[in-house]
């Protein structure tokens, strides 16, 4: 069963339409669905690019039938409804790239080499692959296990299917991010990728003050993917709205920011993790009372980053 991505747009929001990348239709032929939605103007008006890699909900029947677990279990891997949180930021000019494929099919926040070779039939050559705690824990490029539920797949993934997922989903997504960031850098002098994720509820995160756990985590891989002043701008914007923040703990940023963040070239990358209790209902399935507030949070962070980015070329010129 497929669930098309819906964009949460209150009545006062401008009506946004996804701009699809991909081949055009010719002579009545239907073009294949692109691996992502692109939201934003064809000619970017902001140096901020948003990435939402874990909110895809296009569960192909073939994928669901290949799983030994029900679709509801596969959905627990999602960053639930994070795609619907970015409408205010895109209405303000940011460009967003939103994955269509669910994380269960392929994890866009993993290196394409970060996979258990035994998951593929015939097995991939071990040389050149990246083995990590994530692959050993079943959450590599293609997730293989869900904690508490066991193995996901009835059989190993064929090499042809593995190559299809990498070639038609993973690589095009990252190529699109790279192109958008480079375009923004050339046009504005600097660019930033804000990689948007959500995390399981943290005890105390719904509270305020020093005793409350941080509900918004920013990650720049310990200062390697963005400048300190940009991180400070994001933190300041979130705290101004009353959110408690932390940096790099427990989430320092994943493959997306590591791959695309090149501060020395004027391309920065910052991960934001949002406690799901902030914006979902008690069942963590549907929008909750705080949903619109988190939409405003992301927009405020994106705007603060944009303002600081636009100052960077002037600062360099003044040196």
Regions found by a protein language model. Give the residues of each.
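Extreme N-terminal basic, low-complexity initiation segments
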Residues: 1-12
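N-terminal polybasic/positive-inside topogenic patches
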Residues: 15-23
């Amino acid at each position: 069963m497929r669930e098309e991505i819906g964009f949460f747009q209150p009545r006062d929001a401008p009506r946004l339409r996804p701009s699809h990348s991909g081949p055009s239709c010719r002579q009545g032929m239907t073009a294949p669905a692109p691996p992502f939605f692109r939201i934003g103007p064809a000619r970017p008006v902001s140096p901020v690019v948003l990435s939402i890699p874990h909110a895809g909900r296009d569960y192909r029947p073939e994928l669901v039938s290949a799983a030994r677990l029900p679709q509801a279990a596969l959905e627990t891997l999602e960053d639930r409804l994070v795609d619907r949180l970015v409408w205010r930021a895109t209405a303000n000019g940011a460009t967003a790239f939103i994955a269509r494929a669910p994380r269960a099919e392929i994890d866009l926040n993993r290196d394409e080499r970060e996979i258990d070779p035994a998951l593929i039939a015939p097995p991939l050559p071990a040389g050149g692959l990246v083995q990590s705690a994530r692959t050993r824990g079943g959450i590599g490029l293609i997730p293989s296990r869900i904690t508490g539920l066991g193995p996901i797949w009835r059989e190993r993934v064929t090499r042809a299917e593995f190559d299809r997922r990498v070639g038609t989903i993973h690589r095009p997504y990252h190529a699109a991010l790279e192109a958008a960031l480079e375009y923004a850098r050339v046009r504005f002098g600097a660019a930033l990728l804000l990689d948007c994720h959500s995390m399981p509820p943290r005890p105390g995160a719904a509270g305020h003050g020093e005793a409350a756990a941080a509900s918004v985590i920013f990650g720049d891989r310990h200062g390697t993917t963005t400048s300190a002043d940009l991180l400070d701008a994001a933190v300041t914007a979130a705290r101004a709205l009353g959110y408690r923040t932390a940096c790099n703990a427990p989430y320092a940023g994943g493959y997306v920011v590591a791959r695309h963040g090149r501060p020395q070239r004027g391309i920065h990358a910052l991960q934001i993790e949002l406690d799901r209790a902030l914006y979902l209902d008690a069942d963590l399935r549907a929008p909750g009372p705080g949903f619109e507030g988190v939409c405003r949070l992301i927009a405020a962070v994106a705007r603060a980053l944009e303002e600081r980015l636009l100052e960077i070329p002037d600062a360099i010129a003044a040196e």
